């Protein structure tokens, strides 16, 4: 799980793709010969085609909100500090908790991100893009990405994390792609932490039970989840309901932590109950 990755370390490690070095190069683990760029490109394309041939869509997790090492990043080497948000005291903004935040509101950074996403859609035929900490990217950039990709690929989907993270913006009046700004990015979905925490328990207390493990939760809050979270989602399709993802424990492991005395058969039923909730919600 990426939450176990210390992204402030300066030594290479397996990082689940959350330590970006070059946004337009496939990761070497997907290639039989990672030391040859042409092999990386060809074999990732072959992999995506094979998945498509078997009826599977491919959604790419993209991490444009930060880079591995802002000082060493290629664009910051060419134009120092341009790609990253830097505070008035000269320090890199760190809303991502990864050491730096991307200054997507700057025109050429925005163009780079738009061109990069279009490249993956055009060349690799990705069916969707899941944005890590989308809330550090401004709404104008998100809208330009979707508009550019949809010109050629109208069915590509877009969604991401809309958590409200604090960052040092480089311009006044910039609006970020947080949950509560969903009306500014129509067609972009946001993960709903509300239904996640109601079903499995709060993320910040690993043994706190959720509804499926017997905790008493707000009936009104559950109803709001079923109705697509109208408090922040402008449209139901902007609310991505879920109970488990790549972060933290799996749902079944979380149930084991919050209902340790329950037999396995009961834990399976709790797991199925959670699935029924998010699958039947708007």
Named regions from a protein language model:
Residues 2-124, 134, 142-153, 157:
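Substrate-binding/active-site clefts of carbohydrate-active enzymes
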Residues 66, 137, 166:
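Feature marks short, surface-exposed loop/turn motifs that line or immediately flank catalytic pockets
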Residues 146-282:
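Conserved alpha/beta catalytic core and glycan-binding cleft of carbohydrate-active enzymes
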């Amino acid at each position: 799980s990426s939450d176990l990755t210390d992204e402030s370390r300066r030594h290479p490690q397996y990082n689940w793709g959350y330590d970006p070095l070059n946004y337009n190069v496939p990761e070497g683990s997907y290639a039989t010969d990672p030391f040859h760029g042409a092999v990386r490109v060809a074999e990732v394309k072959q992999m995506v085609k094979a998945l498509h041939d078997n009826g599977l869509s491919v959604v790419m997790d993209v991490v444009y909100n930060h880079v591995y090492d802002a000082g060493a990043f290629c664009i910051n080497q060419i134009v120092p500090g341009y790609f990253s948000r830097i505070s008035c005291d000269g320090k890199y903004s760190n809303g991502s908790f990864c050491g730096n935040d991307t200054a997507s509101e700057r025109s050429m950074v925005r163009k780079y991100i738009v061109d990069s996403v279009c490249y993956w859609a055009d060349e690799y035929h990705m069916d969707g893009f899941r944005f890590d900490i989308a809330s550090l990217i401004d709404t104008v950039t998100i809208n330009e990405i979707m508009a550019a990709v949809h010109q050629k690929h109208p069915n590509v989907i877009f969604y991401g994390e809309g958590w409200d993270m604090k960052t040092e913006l480089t311009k006044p009046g910039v609006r970020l792609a947080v949950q509560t700004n969903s009306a500014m990015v129509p067609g972009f979905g946001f993960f709903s932490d509300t239904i996640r925490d109601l079903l499995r328990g709060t993320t910040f207390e690993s043994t706190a039970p959720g509804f499926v493990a017997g905790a008493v939760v707000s009936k009104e809050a559950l109803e709001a989840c079923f109705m697509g979270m109208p408090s922040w989602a402008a449209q139901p399709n902007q609310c991505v309901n879920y109970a488990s993802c790549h972060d933290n424990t799996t749902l079944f492991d979380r149930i084991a932590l919050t209902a340790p005395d329950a037999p396995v058969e009961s834990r399976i039923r709790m797991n199925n109950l959670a699935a029924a909730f998010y699958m039947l919600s708007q």
